[in-house]
């Protein structure tokens, strides 16, 4: 029997650089035996012994010639289903894809650019996958989507660990704290940095792992000496890791974490949270509207703290470190959440229901230069707006991190 064909268009397939690539690989692992999968990726991923056909295409080249290249690939491959995982050019040409193809886009973030390109041209898309209830609400409001079945909430999943050793973690004398957000504004890096500085002023024993980028905004500017987190955090023996590691090493660290710290301002549905929870841990998240709130219940399977409060982080960490016995139930509850709500069986079931749905788009049309021009213009206004917002965030981070260093010296 001939397998149906899925074309997965992704902004990244090269692991180690973020959740979108991880999502793509997990997607392929789940569907590769049931479907014939083709990949189009924006990055320079190099296959290593894979039997999956992979195309490379610049998703940010909005020329009509590049759009035609993508349409030619679609015409030659003749997929039954196309998944758009943050592939910007595909969002723009959605109105020109053949009507018989089911088109599903994935919104990897609760709002902002990743959500914009998932909902762009929504009337020509059959379904949109949101990773959270907050993300679904944002898409409905932003793109005025009235159809109740247009957007489906399908949480990420994580393969379970055969023998998570919770008991050894509970019995540790020195607890491991892991923050996996690098210097990201969305992960509240500056708030976490300030909290760590306060925590390091105590004599409490712990091990800290800061995973991800350590270069702060303005780090390449030759007129400043404050270039990375290393210039702000002291040389303290309790800091065990500062900087990026491979995905495999990150998974090992997350598996062994006691306290998982990710008080994000915005999220889709963080894979790192699931990677930590499947080993049993105490997750700490913020009360900002993002996907983590869909699965974390305060003091049951995690801790929820006020957003933008470094003192709340410090107080919570100190309380856990000093009164660890009062929190050990969270280890098993977080693991149970993964095993009962976020496993591959549930994800597969929801995805297959989505794939069996009838096509749900208005009639698509032929590509013309004038129609394409106006769609590109609209997309570029999104990107310009995002660029301005991002520069403001970068300026805030530039000032805040240097303020922290100034406070240390004075």
Residue ranges and their predicted role:
Residues 7-9, 129, 169-187, 193-196, ...:
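Conserved donor-binding/catalytic core segment of Leloir-type glycosyltransferases
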Residues 84-90:
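Short His-centered aromatic/hydrophobic patch
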Residues 222-245:
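Nucleotide-activated donor-binding/catalytic signature segment of Leloir-type glycosyltransferases, i.e.
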Residues 244-245, 252-257:
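Short alpha-helical donor nucleotide-sugar binding micro-motif in glycosyltransferases
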Residues 265:
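Aromatic "clamp/platform" in nucleotide-sugar-dependent glycosyltransferases that forms part
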Residues 282-286:
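Short hydrophobic beta-strand element within catalytic cores of glycosyltransferases
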Residues 298-299, 303-310, 319-324:
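Conserved acidic donor-binding segment of nucleotide-sugar-dependent glycosyltransferases
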Residues 325-374:
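A charged, aromatic-enriched C-terminal amphipathic alpha-helix characteristic of glycosyltransferases
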């Amino acid at each position: 029997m001939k397998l149906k064909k899925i074309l997965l268009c992704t902004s990244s397939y090269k692991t180690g650089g973020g959740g979108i690539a991880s999502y793509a690989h997990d997607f392929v692992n789940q569907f590769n035996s049931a479907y014939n999968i083709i990949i189009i990726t924006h990055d320079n991923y190099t296959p290593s012994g894979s039997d999956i056909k992979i195309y490379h295409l610049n998703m940010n080249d909005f020329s009509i010639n590049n759009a035609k290249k993508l349409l030619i690939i679609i015409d030659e491959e003749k997929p039954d289903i196309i998944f758009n995982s943050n592939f910007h050019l595909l969002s723009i040409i959605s109105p020109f894809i053949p009507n018989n193809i089911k088109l599903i886009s994935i919104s990897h973030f609760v709002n902002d650019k990743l959500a914009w390109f998932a909902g762009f041209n929504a009337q020509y898309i059959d379904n949109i996958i949101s990773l959270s209830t907050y993300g679904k609400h944002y898409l409905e409001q932003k793109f005025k989507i009235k159809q109740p079945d247009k957007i489906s909430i399908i949480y990420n999943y994580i393969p379970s660990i055969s023998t998570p050793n919770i008991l050894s973690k509970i019995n540790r004398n020195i607890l491991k704290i892991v923050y996996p957000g690098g210097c990201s504004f969305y992960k509240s890096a500056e708030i976490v940095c300030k909290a760590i500085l306060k925590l390091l002023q105590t004599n409490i024993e712990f091990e800290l792992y800061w995973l991800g980028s350590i270069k702060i905004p303005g780090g390449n500017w030759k007129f400043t000496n404050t270039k990375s987190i290393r210039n702000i955090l002291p040389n303290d023996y309790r800091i065990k890791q500062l900087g990026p590691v491979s995905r495999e090493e990150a998974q090992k660290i997350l598996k062994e974490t006691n306290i998982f710290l990710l008080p994000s301002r915005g999220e889709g549905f963080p894979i790192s949270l699931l990677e930590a929870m499947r080993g049993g841990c105490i997750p700490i998240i913020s009360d900002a509207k993002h996907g983590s709130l869909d699965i974390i219940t305060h003091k049951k399977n995690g801790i929820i703290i006020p957003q933008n409060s470094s003192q709340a982080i410090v107080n919570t960490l100190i309380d856990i470190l000093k009164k660890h016995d009062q929190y050990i139930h969270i280890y098993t509850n977080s693991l149970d959440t993964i095993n009962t709500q976020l496993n591959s069986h549930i994800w597969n079931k929801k995805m297959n229901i989505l794939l069996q749905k009838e096509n749900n788009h208005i009639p698509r049309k032929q590509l013309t230069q004038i129609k394409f021009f106006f769609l590109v213009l609209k997309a570029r206004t999104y990107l310009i707006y995002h660029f301005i917002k991002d520069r403001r965030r970068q300026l805030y981070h530039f000032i805040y991190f240097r303020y922290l260093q100034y406070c240390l010296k004075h």
